[in-house]
Amino acid sequence: MGKTQSLPILITGGGRRIGLALAWHFINQKQPVIVSYRTHYPAIDGLIKAGAQCIQADFSTNDGVMAFADEVLKSTHGLRAILHNASAWMAEKPGAPLTDVLACMMQIHVNTPYLLNHALERLLRGHGHAASDIIHFTDYVVERGSDKHIAYAASKAALDNMTRSFARKLAPEVKVNSIAPSLILFNEHDDAEYRQQALNKSLMKTAPGEKEVIDLVDYLLTSCFVTGRSLPLDGGRHLR
């Protein structure tokens, strides 16, 4: 008998940085991947050439979220996992309407995973005990709060809470966990002074890079028992 085709892993926001690194990690393991992207970065062409299914999506509206869900439903009969990596970063600053800031943060970090988890639930079920996963990417600020990014922190805290609710709803077929990172990697334009200030915020004083996230994702995917948990990835920052 031929080998059964693996079910794809869905990664939202997979066109750059951590999402892109995760996509390549799974592709290199011969694991089918579906990636959402909003902006067509050159890296998307590389993913497509490597066999990934890349779907352009606009998560700024609920209609856009559901249109993306419909495309996923048309493309596969099942999913191995959903990794909710799509994110946005908006601060409260002069001239930015506060209602717009809050609505934007809640839309991408709460409405989008909430709607996708419900819409794609049937693709995750029916594959066996603890055979599927949902992983939410939250943030270190869920624990600490943020005076400069209040809406962002609140939206990530809501996503953290949804982790436990969906874990209760979908067990034992689907494990639902979250990863709460702080600094993982710098942007290219970050200057030396900023980098040193950021590094000093954690005990480990390093930006570990995408591999640290990949290893933790692999751990959650291979576990048959861990669910409803938030795993911090902060280098001991909470002890500073």
Swiss-Prot record:
**What does it catalyze?**
(6S)-5,6,7,8-tetrahydrofolate + NADP(+) = 7,8-dihydrofolate + NADPH + H(+); 7,8-dihydromonapterin + NADPH + H(+) = 5,6,7,8-tetrahydromonapterin + NADP(+)
Kindly list the biological process annotations in GO that this record carries: one-carbon metabolic process
Q: Does the keyword Oxidoreductase apply?
A: yes
SUPFAM superfamilies assigned: NAD(P)-binding Rossmann-fold domains
Asked if the keyword NADP belongs to this entry, the reply reads yes
The UniProt keywords, alphabetically, are:
NADP, One-carbon metabolism, Oxidoreductase
- Catalytic positions are Y152
Enzyme Commission numbers on file: 1.5.1.50, 1.5.1.3
Domain of life where this protein originates? Bacteria
**MF GO annotations:** dihydrofolate reductase activity
Enzyme group, top EC level? oxidoreductase
Q: Its function?
A: Catalyzes the reduction of dihydromonapterin to tetrahydromonapterin. Also has lower activity with dihydrofolate.
Alphabetical list of PANTHER family matching this protein:
DIHYDROMONAPTERIN REDUCTASE, OXIDOREDUCTASE, SHORT-CHAIN DEHYDROGENASE/REDUCTASE FAMILY (AFU_ORTHOLOGUE AFUA_5G02870)
What family is this protein classified in? Belongs to the short-chain dehydrogenases/reductases (SDR) family. FolM subfamily.
Protein name, entry field: Dihydromonapterin reductase
